[in-house]
Amino acid sequence: MNTPTPTQRTWYRTTIFNVSVVAVCAFIAPGLWAAMNGLGGAGSADPYYVNAANAVIFCLQVVVCVFGSSLIAKIGLKWAFALGMVGFPIYASSVYCNVKYNNSWYIMLACVIDGICSGIFWLTEGAIVLAYPEKHRRGKYLAYWLASRIMGQMIGGAVTLGVNAGNQEEGHISVQTYLVFISIQAIGPFVAATLSPPEKVQRSDQSKVKINLPAGLKAELHAMWKLLGRTEILLLLPMMFQSVFSEAFFSTYNATYFTVRSRALSSLVASTCVIISNFLLGFFLDWRRLSVNTRAMAAFIIIYAFELSLYVYAMVVNKEYERQEPRPLFDWTDDGFGRAVCVYILMLVGFNLMYDYLYWLIGTVNRDGGDIIRLSAVVRGVESAGQAISYGINSVDSFLLSSAVAVNLSFFAACIVPSAFVIYRVGVVNGVKVHHIQQDETLQTSGEGSHDIMDANGKSDD
C-alpha cells in the first residue's frame, strides 16, 4: 500500500470524514433523543415523570464527565466514543415500554445506563469536534455537526408527524414512532467504530491533532483542577451552565400547549429554522475578513440581544396562557397557533445559536490542543449540571412555565458580564486584533490577557 503524500490523503483519515462520523452519530443518538424530547417529555402523555428521569441522566453525566477521561485513556477515544452510543437505544426502548405498558421501573434503569453511556459520549464527542478540525474551518464544522444533530430532530419530527397526523388530541405519540427511533439508534455504535484515532487523522494543513490522554486518575484530577483555575475558563462557567438550561422549558412548553400532531409539526419547522441559522452563524464565525475579536463580539451581541428579547416574549405569552381557564391546547387549525408556536421555534433557534457559539468560543480561547479532553469534560460536565437542575425543576407539575422562564432569565443575566470579559479579549495579541489563531500550539499570554498567537501577517496559511 502506498504511503499518502502531503497532498494525497486517505479519505477515511481526513477531517471531513471523521467529523462526518461524529455528525452521523449526532444525528442517530442525541438528534433522535432531542426529537423525542422536543415533543415534550419524550412524546409521552406525562412529561413530568420523563423530565425527572432525564434529570437522573444528566446527574450521572456530571460524574462521568469528571472521571470519564481515565476510561478514554485505557480504551482509546475511538472505542470510548462507540461505547457512548450504546445507551441511547436502551433509553428509547424504555420510553416505548413506559408508553405502551405503563412500565416505570425500566425507564429509571435505562436512564442510569444511558446516563453513564451518554456521559462518555458527550465527553468524547465534544473533544473530537473541538480537536479534529483545522481552526480556520472550525465554525463551519461546528455548524455541520450541530446541523446533523438537528437533522435528527427534523427527520424524527417528520416521522412523528407522518405517524400521528390524525391525532388532534393531547397525550402520547403513537408507539410505532418509538420503534423507528430504536431501530435507527441501534446502529450507532457501529457507525462510531469507523472513527479514526486522533494520531491517524490527516488534516488539510498537515498539522497534527494533539490530544493528551491522562496518565492516571490522580494526575488527571490535578490537571482538571489546574484547568478550572484558569481565569477565562472560570469566567465562562456561567455561560456553559446557562447555554443548555432552557431545553427542559421549551420541551415541556411544547407538551403542555399543543396537540400531538402540532407538537410534531412544530418540532419539524423549528429544526429547519435551526439548521439555516446555525450555518449562517458558522460561516460568519469563519469569515476571516473580520478579526477574530470582531466576529466574537458581534456574534455575542446579536445572540444575546435575540435571547433577551425572546425571554421577555416567552414570559408575556406564558403569563397570558396561565391566566386562561381551561388551559389552552393548540392544534395547527386553531386561532393563536402561530403566536404560540413562535415561542417554541424561536427558543430552539436561540438555544442552538448559543450552543454553536459557545463551542466556537471554547475552541478559540483554548490554550493548548492537548487539553481538549479535560476541557470537553469541563464544558459537558457543567452543561449536564445545568440540564439536571433544569429538568428537575420542570419535573414538578405545580411549577409554572412562567416561573421556569424567570429562572432561565436569571441565569442568562448572570452570565453576560463574566462572558463579556473573556470575549472582549479574544483574538487580541499585544494590542493587535488578529485574523487567525494557529492550530494546537501552546499559546502565549499577551499584554491584553489573551492566549492567542498569530503568524507574521496576522493571517493563516490555507
Curated annotation (Swiss-Prot):
Alphabetized, the UniProt keywords read: Glycoprotein, Membrane, Transmembrane, Transmembrane helix
Glycosylation site list: 102, 254
How is it used in the lab or industry? Notoamides have been shown to exhibit antitumoral activities. Notoamides A-C show moderate cytotoxicity against HeLa and L1210 cells with IC(50) values in the range of 22-52 mg/ml, but the IC(50) value of notoamide D is greater than 100 mg/ml. Moreover, notoamide C induces G2/M-cell cycle arrest at a concentration of 6.3 mg/ml.
First-listed, main subcellular location of the protein, grouped into a coarse class: membrane
GO cellular component, as recorded: membrane
Region: Disordered; residue ranges are 443-462
Residues in a coiled coil are: none
Q: Does the keyword Nucleus apply?
A: no
Query: What SUPFAM superfamilies does this protein's entry cite?
Result: MFS general substrate transporter (SSF103473)
> Where are the membrane-spanning stretches?
16-36, 55-75, 79-99, 104-124, 143-163, 173-193, 233-253, 265-285, 297-317, 343-363, 404-424
Under the heading InterPro entries, the entry gives:
MFS, MFS_trans_sf, UNC-93-like_regulator
Give the membrane topology: Multi-pass membrane protein
Q: Does the keyword Transmembrane apply?
A: yes
For this chain, one GO molecular function annotation is: transmembrane transporter activity
Protein localization: Membrane
Which portions of the chain have biased composition (kind: Basic and acidic residues)?
449-462
Family the entry assigns: Belongs to the unc-93 family.
Question: What's the stated role of this polypeptide?
Answer: Part of the gene cluster that mediates the biosynthesis of notoamide, a fungal indole alkaloid that belongs to a family of natural products containing a characteristic bicyclo[2.2.2]diazaoctane core. The first step of notoamide biosynthesis involves coupling of L-proline and L-tryptophan by the bimodular NRPS notE', to produce cyclo-L-tryptophan-L-proline called brevianamide F.
**Under which name does UniProt file this protein?**
Notoamide biosynthesis cluster protein O'
Which species is listed as the source?
A: Aspergillus versicolor
Q: Which gene encodes it?
A: notO'
